[in-house]
Every structure is written in structure tokens, then in C-alpha cells.
């Protein structure tokens, strides 16, 4: 499974959204209905899945599906 597929799978599981709604440009809050707690849990799930640490100031910049994929790809 690619990084992109793994990130999308986590987003579907964490936010309870349909896979077809998880488009690269989709915003977690505006498009996928996440609240601040959801985004914190999403970042924690990404950290666990990819065994990385995402500092708070970086986590704040991860607001879309593509930004999450890019962050993981650049920090693995």
C-alpha cells in the first residue's frame, strides 16, 4: 500500500467519511467536517502509522488531504 493510500485510509477511519470524498484538495474541516479534536486525533494516527513525530507548528499546517500526504512523504 502506498503512502497516499495509507494516509487516505487513516482519514476515512478517523473522520468517518467516504473514501470517494477524500480528494487531494479536500480540507479536513471545510470539506470533511472535522473539528479541532478530529484533526488532533488524525495527526496522532498519522504519527503512529508512519512512526514519525509531527510538531504542533507543523500539525497546524496539515489542513488538507494532500498536505498530510506531502508531510508524510517528506518526513519518513
From Swiss-Prot:
Chain ranges of the Carrier domain: 1-76
SUPFAM superfamilies membership: ACP-like
InterPro entries: ACP, ACP-like_sf, PP-bd_ACP, Ppantetheine_attach_site
Keywords: Cytoplasm, Fatty acid biosynthesis, Fatty acid metabolism, Lipid biosynthesis, Lipid metabolism, Phosphopantetheine, Phosphoprotein
Mod. after translation: 4'-phosphopantetheine is transferred from CoA to a specific serine of apo-ACP by AcpS. This modification is essential for activity because fatty acids are bound in thioester linkage to the sulfhydryl of the prosthetic group.
Location within or outside the cell: Cytoplasm
A GO term, aspect molecular function: acyl carrier activity
Cellular-component GO terms for this entry: cytosol; membrane
PTM-bearing positions, type O-(pantetheine 4'-phosphoryl)serine: 36
Pfam families: PP-binding
GO BP term, pick one: lipid A biosynthetic process
Pathway, per record: Lipid metabolism; fatty acid biosynthesis
Superkingdom field: Bacteria
Family: Belongs to the acyl carrier protein (ACP) family.
Role played: Carrier of the growing fatty acid chain in fatty acid biosynthesis.
HAMAP family associated with the record: Acyl_carrier (MF_01217)
Name of the protein this chain belongs to: Acyl carrier protein
Species assigned in the record: Haemophilus influenzae (strain ATCC 51907 / DSM 11121 / KW20 / Rd)
Gene of this entry: acpP
Amino acid at each position: 500500500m502506498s503512502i497516499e493510500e495509507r494516509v487516505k485510509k487513516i482519514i476515512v477511519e478517523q473522520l468517518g467519511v467516504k473514501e470517494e470524498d477524500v480528494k487531494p484538495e479536500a480540507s479536513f474541516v471545510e470539506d470533511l467536517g472535522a473539528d479541532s479534536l478530529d484533526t488532533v486525533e488524525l495527526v496522532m494516527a498519522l504519527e503512529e502509522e508512519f512512526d514519525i513525530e509531527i510538531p504542533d507548528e507543523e500539525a497546524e499546517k496539515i489542513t488538507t488531504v494532500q498536505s498530510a500526504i506531502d508531510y508524510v512523504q517528506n518526513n519518513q
